Amino acid sequence: MGGKDMKVSNEIIAGKLIMQIQIFIDNSRISSLEGRYGKVTMIPFTGHVKSEIFTGEIVPGGVDVQIENAAGNRNMCAKYMFRGTDKEGKECSLFVENNGYVSRTELQKEYVDAFPRFITDSKILGEYLSQPRF
């Protein structure tokens, strides 16, 4: 994330890392279903985030759901919530929904183009993360 004079509220921080989330997966908890018309994999996870604007832990219930249709196209949706403190030291929660779509021809890509959505009860996080910039 940016330097000491960075403003969070309503300022686009192009090319700067604003949060780095560390995810932990227990492979024994992964569930999957594969049938003639597609495949579903549910990957529960835990984790945390430390950044200049927010520090917190993922509450139980975080899951990444990957659905692949018969044509081999995949939809991925991760939903999880953090509890922690914002930049001002106030306790808050941050919900994250991250959606990505990958065509059969793109499955081997190193990264997936994903589109996050944030909901929070923190005024400072809400002003920044609720903008249509991600």
Model-derived features with residue positions:
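Beta-strand-enriched cores of mature, soluble protein domains
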Residues: 2-134
